[in-house]
Amino acid sequence: MRAAPFDFFFQSTALSTFFILCSLATNEIPTISGAPAGKIVQPPKPNILKQGCPSDLLHSRALRSIQLACRTHPATVISAFEGVQEGLQNCANRLRFQQWDCSEAGNIMHDPPLLRQGFRESSLIWALSSASAAWGVATACAQGWIDDCACNNQMGQNEYEFGGCTHGVQHGITASRKLLTKVGAVNTLLRKVEKHNLKAGRLAIKKTLISSCKCHGVSGSCQQKTCWKRTATLEHITDYLVEKYARAKLYTDDSVVKTTDLIYLEASPDVCKAKSVAGRVCAWRNETHTQGDCDRLCCGNGFSIRHEVVRVKCDCEFVWCCNLVCKDCIQHRWISTCNGTPPKSLIF
């Protein structure tokens, strides 16, 4: 069964907490008590970035560049990998009411079957993986957790200028290109489409950049302003690429496409025949028969409705200064899920 939207947000990989904190930190970096004016202290590096690459990446057969980078820049590879994982989860949440929902696409660093085909869905996974890898590395850079990133001040002080880190964005984009682009591969039409969509993903990072500024001066006056570019949230980047996916273009040798377009080579197989929809949560009261409608989402296999009683936090309020106090409430839920049979294909 698919998780409810808010439950889904908290079901993530080993670095989910790291990325949540990073997103908060890069959006509004707090002043650390006792730190010099205009300075912030770098947050400690998460243990997962200190442990080196796991064996599946260290011995990856899909991408030779992953193997090499694991030996020289493991923190970069792990940040990219976890960024991709986070991106796939965002995609599954974003498309949870569509028949194909990213949930079984697989991480690009593991060479999933979907990326050996030129489907419309493949174009989204290529682009989203590329963008998410760049986002993961840029986010880690902004925190000073990657040693060779220009954002990390290695001058002997565990602090750096409050001015944001535009360098981290470019470092993330460069890392994504080097890690995910296959070098020396056969120059087939599929490979051309793959490279195009990977680049479109990297461009999505640039297209969604956000400008941030901080004023410097006495009593909050803006005598001097420091501005920098930072990455958007991964949710926003995912939304941007999902919209591109909806308008993806069929590619031929004489096609004229923009570098930001997603492109594909062949029609997708029927999702209802290619994969199982059993357990998918659907909207059985959807009278408009649009997104999430059980009749459409369940491919005509029918659906089941069950009643759940869950305990949730409610009526939350902050108690000065820093405690969040909530009541425990009982909530009744009627959940409809698709019936179905095992999948007939491993592609989706």
Curated annotation (Swiss-Prot):
Domain of life: Eukaryota
Reported tissue expression: Expressed in the tail hypodermis.
Protein name per the record: Abnormal cell lineage protein 44
Gene designation per UniProt: lin-44
Organism: Caenorhabditis elegans
Family: Belongs to the Wnt family.
Sites where a glycan is attached: 286
PROSITE patterns membership: WNT1 (PS00246)
Position of the signal peptide: 1-25
Lineage of the species this protein comes from: Eukaryota, Metazoa, Ecdysozoa, Nematoda, Chromadorea
